Design a protein with these regions (language model features):
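A short helix->beta-strand "capping" segment at the edge of beta-propeller domains
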Residues: 19-39, 203-213
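Beta-strand-rich domains and repeat architectures in extracellular enzymes and scaffolds
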Residues: 33-69
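Short glycine/acidic-enriched loop and turn motifs that connect beta-strands
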Residues: 59-63, 109-112, 154-157, 243-246, ...
Length: 711
């Protein structure tokens, strides 16, 4: 039996505390308000004795328009969760120390983000770090005598410092690329500091990258998983792309470095000591350049997330083969520190590796990877022989191994369930067991639609996997308006994901059938399928979308006169392109943060390796046949003379990946052509919509637009 969370403690400032919510639901249909009331499970750590775990749950207040993270403990035998913290300040990153008697975590209770310590029962809270800068993350050495602290340092390579006598000046003098990244102007970089810990206080922090302008972890999404301690606590393996400015902007070549804490010496584990990179042309793809054809044993692409084997003999990490290709297949590279030999142990797995961890005996690794629209758990030995440990219609993410090595802890989600914590016993034919019931209230009181796997024949005779999500209380004798969901990435899987924005069940709850194709360019179907999108945005992947909607439209319960297409990022590009090429299939479009003009995108985005690889080169360079690259000659904005359908354009003005000018351009175009259109701008959001009230406004605007034209 699985127990629900109990022993909820009332905080001193109950009116300000954002915690677990059980709102009164108006019906059994998912609503934006219900979606934002759900808890979101974060980090999870098991105690050294394997009897309990500490984990974080983030809750959102629509009224206060902010989030708050709370710590819980979980009894791994009874499955009972107990709320551990009641502060109005968020706590996160919790881990056990002192044999499991104490928990260290991050909190901003003192006014800045610092490390705090408490007893395992939540008593005796005390601050143990007092750094001048905020601590973003941390990692204790196995002997707990040292700790890595991630803190920001000034970085003024691209944006120079203003004159000291102009402290109120807001202008920025920019001298190189990568002056902005994701949603931030780059004036600092995260660095790892190694500090001493005596069990009570943290001090004497030393910057591993002192004097270097590089970042570790890598921005914008890297975390403490990009660093690892050796089992003897003497070495640190860390991830770093030692480049700045334009060199950084065109390259995905990060490496794994080994740092000796006693001597301060650093060794690059990915390249020989005498390696010198060849000169590259910055404004065209690195695919066929010399950088991707080394004549020595070099790792040229993304190398990140190192983990030492428990016996200390090996280091494993995630490795991509090619520089400049951020969606290359991620392989598991294992380096034998005795022989200095590298082995890629997932070569026979025809998809990429997500998270991974070592077995207790150092003889195998566990990993997750997507295959045919589902992310399951696998095991590989050091010879590269792998097997599946789960085969569920779900998406798993590894959290770690139990101290005795007998259980894997993981999070599992699906299109019908947000993340919950599961345990997978590592014995023959064992099934994953659910440990948490964070959102049980919602699952007990809401009705979700059926999710069905459907294979569609493509124009070139191949098979395309689509997920079809039906409305709750589906009646096959009725006709339903139907949505084509266009995935972003452009090489991100349409797997069994749960999204708090692009949520399939909330679309179904509004009486829409949704078809979500794994079109050309998505992982989980082999390398040929994955790479048939690069340089050809408007080709087979667009035909795959049309094949999917045409196939489902033949069903008697689909109202083929009321079809819509929706999508974000590359999905937004897809919507803009389909608007001029759909042959009157659709009656409404919604594009979120999409690319409207590919030439505009090339010169506006910040990570230049991405358009170089996907578009082939800069728009001012010709392709090998002397023509303009196909991605530019088939840009969505070149088909606006054929636009004839109402369109909603949504964009965040802090989105530096795809600038909001794309949405403004598309909206202006539609209105000038007399087409009904609406523009939803978020001045304070990036590529995503993260604030509760903005999220609800997004959902309401989304469905008002669809209902207006499809119902």
């Amino acid at each position: 039996m699985i127990a629900t969370s109990t022993a909820i403690i009332t905080p001193a400032k109950a009116q300000d505390f954002i915690g677990k919510q059980q709102p009164v639901l108006q019906s059994d249909r998912m609503t934006p308000e219900a979606l934002w009331a759900m808890g979101r499970i974060g980090g999870f750590k098991v105690s050294p004795n394997g009897k309990q775990a500490v984990y974080a749950v983030t809750y959102y207040s629509v009224k206060q328009n902010k989030s708050h993270s709370v710590l819980y403990t979980l009894d791994l035998n009874s499955h009972k969760s107990t709320q551990l913290t009641t502060s109005t300040h968020s706590e996160m990153g919790a881990t056990y120390v002192n044999g499991g008697k104490e928990i260290v975590y991050l909190s901003s209770e003192s006014g800045s983000s610092q490390l705090w310590k408490m007893n395992a029962d939540g008593t005796s809270r005390q601050q143990i770090s007092h750094t001048q800068s905020d601590v973003a993350d941390f990692l204790f050495s196995p002997d707990e005598k040292k700790v890595i602290l991630i803190m920001e340092v000034d970085q003024n390579h691209s944006i120079q410092k203003n004159d000291a006598d102009l402290p109120l000046a807001t202008g920025m003098v920019i001298n190189d690329l990568m002056y902005k990244h994701w949603d931030t102007y780059v004036t600092s970089a995260p660095h790892p500091f190694v500090a001493d810990f005596d069990g009570t206080t943290i001090g004497n922090a030393q910057d591993i990258l002192k004097g270097e302008p590089y970042e570790c972890p890598m921005m914008p999404f890297g975390g403490i998983e990009q660093l690892a301690w050796s089992p003897d606590s003497k070495s640190i393996a860390y991830t770093c792309r030692k480049k700045v400015g334009k060199d950084y902007a065109i390259s995905t070549d990060s490496d794994i470095f080994l740092y000796d804490t006693a001597t301060g010496s650093t060794t690059n584990l990915c390249k020989p000591a005498n390696y010198k990179a060849p000169t590259v042309e910055a404004d065209r793809s690195l695919k066929d350049q010399a950088i991707n054809h080394p004549n020595t044993d070099c790792n040229m692409g993304y190398d990140q997330n190192p983990q030492f084997s428990p016996d200390g003999r090996y280091i494993a990490w995630s490795s991509m083969e090619r520089d400049g290709y951020e969606s290359d297949r991620t392989r598991l590279c294992v380096l034998d520190l005795r022989s200095n030999k590298k082995t890629y142990v997932t070569e026979k797995f025809e998809s990429g590796v997500n998270e991974f961890c070592w077995s207790k005996d150092s003889k195998s690794l566990y990993f997750t990877g997507v295959w045919h629209g589902k992310t399951n758990i696998y095991q590989t030995n050091l010879k590269g022989e792998h097997k599946a440990l789960t085969a569920d219609v779900a998406d798993y993410a590894l959290l770690g191994l139990s101290p005795d090595g007998k259980n894997l802890y993981c999070k599992r989600q699906s299109m019908s369930s947000a993340d919950e914590v599961f345990v997978l016993p590592l014995k023959k034919e064992a099934k994953a067991q659910q440990l948490t019931q964070e959102n049980k209230y919602f699952y007990d009181n809401l009705t979700f639609g059926k999710v069905e796997e459907r294979w569609v024949k493509t124009v070139d005779g191949k098979e395309e996997l689509c997920w079809v999500i039906y409305p709750p209380h589906f009646d096959p004798n009725k006709k339903y308006p139907t949505l084509l969901f266009c995935e972003g990435g452009p090489q991100s899987p349409v797997s069994q994901f749960w999204s708090f924005r692009w949520n399939m069940q909330i679309m179904a709850a509004n009486d829409y059938i949704v078809i979500a194709p794994n079109r050309r360019g998505l992982p989980g179907f082999g390398m040929e399928w994955l790479e048939e999108i690069s340089g050809d945005y408007s080709g087979l992947c667009m035909q795959d979308y049309l094949s999917a909607i045409d196939d489902i439209a033949r069903e008697p319960y689909v109202d083929k006169d009321h079809l819509g297409a929706v999508g974000a990022s590359f999905g937004g590009y897809s919507v803009y392109w389909l608007a001029g090429n759909h042959d009157k299939r659709f009656k409404a479009f919604i594009a979120h943060d999409g690319i409207y003009n590919t030439q505009q995108q090339y010169v506006e985005t910040e990570e230049m390796w991405f358009p170089n690889w996907d578009m082939g080169s800069a728009p001012w360079k010709k392709a090998a046949d002397g023509q303009v690259q196909k991605v530019f000659s088939t840009s969505p904005h070149l088909y606006v003379d054929k636009w004839d359908t109402p369109i909603l354009c949504i964009h965040g003005q802090k989105d530096f990946r795809i600038e909001y000018t794309h949405a403004e351009s598309a909206f202006n175009t539609a209105r000038m052509r007399g087409i009904d259109a609406q523009l939803l701008l978020f001045p304070d959001e990036n590529h995503w919509v993260l604030k509760p009230q903005n999220g609800i406004l997004w959902q309401r605007t989304f469905f008002r637009w669809l209902d207006k034209y499809l119902k």
